[in-house]
């Protein structure tokens, strides 16, 4: 892009107002301006000053590029412009609709390109309207945007399977779904090769011309900014400087470089901090003291249980004797086993496990949403977790006794016991899966205007679903084992027969029960393992 000397001079010009004059400027929308920042300051904690006395104006329809190294404050400045970050000093006004393309894109990688673009319209519709899908008109609009960014052939491809450049285009299309007048692009080409970086910057420039957008981009490559930007500013240590490196300050103000710097990217801030010393307990003397303390605790445990080596003298002969009694010594012992009744009780055991686990999943799902710190109300999280700890404390056999007393003997008591036991563990598995989700996509949908339920439905649940389903399969597996002993207290299943055979010391028949349960568990384990692997690779 060739420019005259006058245009080059204009690129280097920065509209800066002094703190004194900024206070006297009317906050009404000025003609020709899209964004105005006055004496802008932003701190993270007490030590990190991300922005220091930044004043500038962005005109409608221009492309303003912000240059600067990592940690210079580019992300923080864009965050203040979008309203995502609240300045600690000064103010910034964006006079029309703003959309942001984040450096880390913040796309839901488990969802298709089309669905991710549709997420851009979440702020325009109620939670109920988008609970089961999006309006047809919005889908047509999203397809048009994907076609405009060159991804018409990738509509239904999960974003996680797209290349870096393609994902960047999806993020651009999602921003366009918000019908912005101002587009903020935070390092839009940071992870791309030179060819793709040029293509993305060219696309952004074309979209600006086509749609009359005001474009503010934070870029670290000076060549790209010179090729596409109308005006270039530079940040260093949170302060505004000119492109030739000279300080840009107000005529009557003096500023000093801050002792610490940072920006809105928390990872960058953490990298800039000094390395933390190893904790005291990991140093050699402290570690030795911990090791000695652990040894003392174990000695105390053994002495308290009165475990003596002489108790092991007959252990091996005793084990072999028991194993020998398990195996039949005559064919008649096998014939006498009530095989039809055993197989019927085995089917009942599997049925109890299936229904009990399913009920547990249904109950655990909303409880996990309440217990997850990134989803539920903060004032409820701790209370729900305390209740869940109490539920997990009760063994499944005790739950069975409780429900036998409540509903009587039979499989219903077993089903209720398995569901109660499952809730304690599944809820923990689920809320841990919710909390492990990348916070970027839910945060991005929140900026768009999505409600809490919309963020959960469209960003948290898709990412957590593989882990949640995997946990449910594991629980079903476990419940088959647990259900096989609930019959001991007459709560249904094959456990009734196991108890009967052990009471009459019919060990071969008890072994037959355990063997058919083992076969079912092995088959179920093989199937669930394959399913879990497929879920993880989704």
Please give the residue ranges for each predicted region.
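Helix-to-loop junction immediately C-terminal to a conserved catalytic motif
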Residues: 82
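Conserved signature/switch motifs of ABC ATPase nucleotide-binding domains
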Residues: 157, 178
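Conserved ABC ATPase signature
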Residues: 158-162, 166
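Catalytic Walker B motif of ABC-type/P-loop ATPase nucleotide-binding domains
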Residues: 183-186
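Helix N-cap at the start of a conserved alpha-helix in ABC-type nucleotide-binding domains
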Residues: 194-196
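H-loop/switch region of ABC-family ATPase nucleotide-binding domains
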Residues: 219-220
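N-terminal, non-cleaved signal-anchor transmembrane helix
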Residues: 262-358, 370, 374, 378, ...
């Amino acid at each position: 892009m060739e420019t005259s000397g006058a245009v080059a001079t204009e690129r280097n010009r920065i509209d800066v107002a002094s703190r004194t004059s900024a206070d006297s400027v009317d906050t009404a929308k000025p003609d020709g301006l899209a964004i105005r920042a006055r004496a802008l300051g932003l701190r993270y904690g007490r030590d990190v000053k991300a922005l220091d006395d930044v004043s500038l104006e962005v005109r409608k329809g221009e492309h303003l590029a912000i240059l600067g190294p990592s940690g210079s404050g580019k992300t923080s400045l864009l965050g203040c412009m979008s309203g995502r970050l609240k300045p600690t000093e000064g103010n910034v006004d964006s006079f029309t609709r703003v959309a942001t393309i984040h450096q880390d894109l913040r796309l839901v990688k488990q969802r298709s390109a089309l669905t991710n673009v549709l997420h851009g319209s979440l702020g325009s519709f109620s939670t109920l309207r988008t609970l089961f899908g999006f309006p047809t008109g919005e889908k047509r609009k999203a397809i048009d945007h994907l076609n405009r960014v060159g991804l018409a052939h990738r509509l239904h491809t999960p974003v996680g399977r797209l290349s870096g450049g393609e994902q960047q285009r999806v993020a651009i299309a999602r921003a366009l779904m918000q019908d912005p007048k101002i587009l903020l692009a935070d390092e839009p080409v940071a992870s791309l090769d030179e060819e793709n970086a040029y293509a993305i910057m060219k696309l952004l420039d074309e979209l600006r011309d086509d749609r009359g957008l005001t474009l503010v981009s934070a870029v670290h490559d000076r060549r790209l900014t010179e090729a596409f930007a109308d005006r270039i500013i530079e940040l260093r240590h949170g302060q505004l400087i000119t492109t030739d490196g000279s300080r840009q300050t107000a005529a009557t103000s003096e500023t000093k470089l801050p002792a610490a710097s940072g920006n809105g990217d928390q990872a960058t801030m953490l990298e800039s901090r000094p390395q933390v010393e190893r904790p005291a307990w990991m140093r050699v003397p402290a570690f030795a003291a911990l090791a000695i303390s652990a040894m003392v605790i174990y000695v105390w445990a053994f002495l308290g249980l009165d475990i003596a080596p002489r108790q092991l003298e007959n252990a091996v002969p005793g084990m072999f004797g028991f194993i020998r009694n398990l195996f039949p010594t005559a064919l008649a012992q096998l014939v006498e086993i009530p095989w039809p009744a055993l197989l019927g009780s085995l089917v009942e055991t599997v049925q109890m496990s299936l229904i009990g686990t399913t009920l547990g999943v249904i109950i655990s799902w909303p409880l996990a949403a309440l217990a997850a710190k990134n989803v539920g109300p903060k004032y409820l999280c701790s209370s729900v977790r305390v209740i869940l700890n109490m539920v997990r404390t009760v063994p499944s056999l005790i739950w069975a006794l409780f429900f036998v007393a409540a509903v009587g003997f039979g499989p219903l008591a077993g089903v209720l016991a398995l569901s109660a036991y499952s809730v304690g563990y599944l809820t923990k598995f689920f809320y841990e899966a919710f909390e492990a989700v990348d916070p970027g996509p839910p945060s991005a949908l929140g900026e768009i205007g999505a409600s809490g339920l919309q963020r959960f439905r469209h960003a948290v649940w898709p990412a957590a679903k593989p882990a949640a389903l995997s946990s449910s399969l594991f629980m079903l597996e476990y419940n088959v084992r647990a259900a096989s002993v609930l019959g001991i207290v007459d709560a249904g299943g094959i456990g009734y027969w196991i108890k009967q055979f052990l009471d009459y010391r019919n060990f071969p028949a008890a072994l037959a029960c355990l063997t058919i349960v083992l076969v079912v568990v092995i088959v179920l384990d093989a199937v669930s393992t394959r399913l879990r692997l497929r879920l993880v690779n989704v």
